[in-house]
Regions:
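A small-molecule sensor/coupling module
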Residues: 190-193
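Acidic, metal-coordinating catalytic segment for phosphate/diphosphate chemistry
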Residues: 34-72
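Unchanged
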Residues: 98-186
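Acidic surface patches and DE-rich sequence motifs
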Residues: 22-23, 46-48, 77, 135-136
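Short, contiguous, helix-prone interaction/anchoring segments in small proteins
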Residues: 63-92
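Intrinsic disorder/low-complexity segments
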Residues: 1-34
Length: 193
């Protein structure tokens, strides 16, 4: 049959972003080809704990909501356990609203400290941001949460921020995580996968 042809060429896939390697049958010569295509941005937003993908008219979609920016942490201790909170009858991760004149990393650390009583936090990396919607007194809210992986060597007592409806704060072993995830929110499940 001759030279190898990538699927994009043989199946006629137009309008895709493809980086293809075309090699002859002896694999002695390779040629890289890049085909550019502007792909639409996709946003996954959780509505009543169900994910929906928004691709078109993001600005129009957002215009119907009041945007709240927040940050939180996926916090690991020295035993590789994950910090979780129990709030509103669901297992969750510590997070909260961005305050004025605060950057997103400061917000993430402050919220973990306030909601759990944990200190000595260090940010390891940015994980992702998630979106979810809810309603308060008839006002539609779109919350964007920036998530960070964090470490701590904290060994003290965990203290739930009861004013925020948090009734329990625990360190969770990996083998207990599935049980907690079953009673959690969609965006938290996604983050912990």
């Amino acid at each position: 049959m001759g030279d190898f042809q990538p699927a994009a060429h043989t199946n006629g896939l137009l309008g895709c972003k493809i980086i293809a390697f075309i090699c002859n049958k002896d694999l002695a010569t390779c040629l890289a080809i890049s085909i550019s295509y502007i792909m639409p941005q996709k946003y996954k937003v959780y509505f009543n704990n169900e994910p929906k993908i928004i691709t078109d008219n993001w600005e129009i979609f957002c215009a119907d909501y009041y945007l709240i920016e927040a940050a939180g942490g996926l916090v690991y201790n020295n035993e590789n356990q994950i910090l979780m909170i129990f709030r509103n009858n669901k297992w969750d991760l510590p997070k909260g609203k961005l305050e004025q004149n605060e950057n997103i990393k400061e917000c993430a650390i402050r919220e973990v400290q306030e909601e759990c009583g944990v200190t000595g936090l260090s940010i390891v990396s940015f994980l992702k941001d998630t979106y979810h919607t809810y309603e308060i007194n008839g006002k539609k809210i779109l919350k964007r949460t920036y998530w960070f992986a964090m470490n701590t060597d904290f060994k003290g007592s965990l203290v739930p921020e009861t004013e925020e409806g948090i009734t329990e704060v625990v360190w969770v072993d990996k083998d207990q995580l599935a049980e907690k995830i079953n009673n959690s929110f969609g965006n938290i499940k996604e983050l912990l996968r």
